[in-house]
């Protein structure tokens, strides 16, 4: 009985405490105001952007959400209901929603799971039920839910609460968790939202974009139809990267099954940018029915000649073979900074994450009071027992130290300090070593990203992360297609490349990529005689054996069910007889 009750409780928890809105079966596609306009939004811009989404061909390509980010709201009325900013939206939000719907589009809004939004407008914490009621009344289709001013309350409390309130309205609303990747959100968010941010905010630069997709990649196993890893919105068209880099940006988001939310001014978009954003074959990979997130399967470190030493860059930290380059030189300073090559980049815990977090180098801001934790996320101590220990305070009172991730054995993260977290710091050559390898900012490399598609096909993106031209190669045995012939198609050029027996290689310029779709060429089976009478007899024997075995399994299952039912009834009858006996004794 206890086992049965436990099973019922688990089933009830899954059924009644999960997101069940039927949305997000494929990564969402649309446009968002934030990356380009920040708070500079108004109803004219939104109206014009609805028109532009249609006239530019973006809707035909699959983009169907128009999403207002922060600053559409102002404060609350006396009853606690959210009010729109009537200075910038004098006619309110509902007319814009109706206009979008009349054009076949969907409409989204933004809030934060805190007292305030990130720009200081009224947040939704403690007002979840009222806000969900308003969103449903306005016929909203999408909610981006941020993480600012959260009072230190766990995301596992705040985000499910809004989910439940949205569900209670009976109005399907796509629920996008903008939670910055904290508290290992990817491991639990599929029961809460339709997508979840795995990282901090993106900016319009190559370094930011490539570091963010690296961080997103580690969670690839948790994405799939109904819920997606979100490395933030697209920066394509905002001017901070080259067209080549934007093409790679789009390819990486597509193969990673990331949400495709345009972040540029679509009312003033160049043909080159539109060509990237509307590439139908890239988008088809992103929207593939299988919904399997592609991920990094191969990384080849570039072996530069001794006389070439690339400049250090803001990036994740990793453990690599020692080579004496600047990327492997570190200075531990009295102010707590751990500086790469003693320059302006410091080892940083992004967003002061309180759980195990991948660390990176970031612009030094030691002592800056306006940064999270008053910049303690960039302060470290090299202890007597050879640990690199963060000066940040953690809720459990325990300290965190740098260590190498157990899954990758190369990526460096914070973790509870223990005996395995030791590092050797050499004050002469300024290397920091673990197990004979050197701590480094992520060195330049070539990579292959890949993933399965529906109908047995395969997607591959070959990438050159280096600042110099490089050759990138992939062998079929590295992706499980030993002794196979693959038919390859270039998705950018939208043309077939032919058949390749063992491998494929390509020379790529700096930050360029080639996006491929691969299909296995099946060998033509040799001609054989049709099955004769003896073969038919053998086939019938096999079929009979299978049917007998299947019947036995079904009979066992039915027997178990009947047994559990009889046992349950006997238990109840026994309880009833005992109750009747007690009543009779009391009456006597």
How does the language model describe each region?
Residues 127-130, 168-265, 452:
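Glycan-recognition surfaces
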Residues 296-445:
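Lectin-like carbohydrate-binding module/patch detector with strong preference for beta-trefoil
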Residues 529-550:
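Extracellular juxtamembrane-to-transmembrane boundary of type I single-pass membrane glycoproteins
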Residues 499-529:
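C-terminal beta-strand-rich structural cap/linker in extracellular carbohydrate-active enzymes
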Residues 553-568:
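Single-pass type I membrane-protein transmembrane alpha-helix
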Residues 570-588:
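Cytoplasmic C-terminal tails of single-pass
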Residues 253-263, 443-481:
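Carbohydrate-binding surface patches
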Residues 49-152:
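Aromatic-lined carbohydrate-binding/catalytic grooves of carbohydrate-active enzymes
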């Amino acid at each position: 009985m206890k086992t049965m009750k436990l099973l019922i409780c688990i089933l009830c928890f899954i059924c009644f405490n999960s997101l069940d809105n039927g949305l997000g079966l494929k990564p969402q596609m649309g446009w968002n105001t934030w990356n380009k306009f920040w708070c500079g939004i108004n109803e004219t811009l939104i109206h014009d952007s609805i028109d532009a989404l249609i006239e530019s061909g973006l809707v035909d390509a699959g983009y169907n959400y128009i999403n207002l980010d922060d600053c559409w709201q102002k404060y609350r009325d006396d009853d606690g209901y959210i009010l729109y900013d009537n200075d910038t939206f004098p006619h309110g939000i509902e007319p814009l929603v109706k206009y979008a719907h009349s054009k076949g589009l969907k409409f989204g809004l933004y809030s934060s799971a805190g007292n305030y939004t990130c720009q200081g407008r009224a947040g939704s914490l403690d007002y979840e039920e009222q806000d969900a009621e308003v969103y449903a009344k306005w016929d909203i289709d999408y909610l981006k839910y941020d993480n600012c001013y959260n009072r230190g309350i766990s995301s596992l409390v705040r985000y499910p609460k809004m989910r439940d309130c949205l569900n209670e309205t009976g109005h399907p609303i796509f629920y996008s968790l903008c939670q910055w990747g904290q508290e290992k959100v990817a491991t639990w968010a599929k029961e809460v939202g339709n997508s979840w941010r795995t990282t901090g905010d993106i900016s319009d630069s190559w370094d930011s974009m490539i570091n963010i997709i690296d961080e997103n990649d580690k969670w690839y196993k948790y994405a799939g139809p109904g819920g997606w890893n979100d490395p933030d919105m697209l920066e394509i068209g905002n001017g901070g990267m080259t067209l080549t880099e934007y093409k790679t940006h789009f390819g990486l988001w597509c193969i990673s099954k990331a949400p495709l939310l345009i972040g540029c001014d679509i009312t003033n978009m160049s043909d080159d940018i539109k060509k990237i954003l509307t590439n139908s074959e890239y988008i088809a990979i992103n929207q593939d029915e299988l919904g399997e997130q592609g991920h990094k399967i191969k990384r080849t470190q570039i072996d530069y000649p001794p006389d070439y030493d690339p400049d250090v860059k803001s990036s994740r930290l990793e453990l690599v073979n020692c080579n004496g380059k600047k990327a492997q030189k570190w200075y531990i300073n009295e102010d707590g900074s751990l500086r790469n090559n003693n320059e302006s980049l410091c080892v940083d815990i992004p967003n002061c994450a309180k759980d195990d977090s991948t660390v990176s180098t970031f612009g030094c801001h030691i002592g800056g009071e306006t940064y999270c934790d008053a910049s303690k996320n960039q302060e470290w101590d090299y202890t007597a027992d050879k640990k690199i220990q963060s000066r940040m305070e953690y809720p459990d009172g325990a300290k965190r130290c740098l260590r190498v991730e157990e899954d990758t054995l190369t990526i460096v993260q914070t973790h509870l300090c223990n005996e395995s977290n030791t590092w050797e710091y050499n004050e002469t050559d300024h290397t920091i070593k673990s197990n004979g390898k050197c701590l480094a900012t992520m060195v330049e490399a070539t990579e292959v990203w890949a993933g399965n598609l529906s109908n047995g096909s395969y997607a591959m993106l070959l990438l050159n992360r280096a600042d110099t031209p490089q050759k990138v190669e992939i062998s079929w045995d590295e992706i499980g297609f030993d002794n196979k012939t693959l038919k390859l198609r270039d998705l950018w050029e939208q043309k077939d490349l032919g058949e390749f027996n063992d491998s494929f290689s390509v020379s790529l310029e700096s930050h360029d990529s080639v996006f491929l779709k691969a299909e296995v060429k099946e060998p033509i089976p040799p001609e054989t005689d049709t099955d004769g009478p003896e073969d038919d007899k053998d086939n019938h024997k096999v079929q009979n054996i299978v049917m007998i075995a299947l019947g036995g399994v079904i009979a066992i299952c039915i027997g178990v069910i009947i047994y559990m039912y009889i046992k349950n009834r006997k238990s109840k009858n026994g309880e009833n007889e005992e109750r009747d006996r007690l009543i009779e004794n009391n009456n006597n």
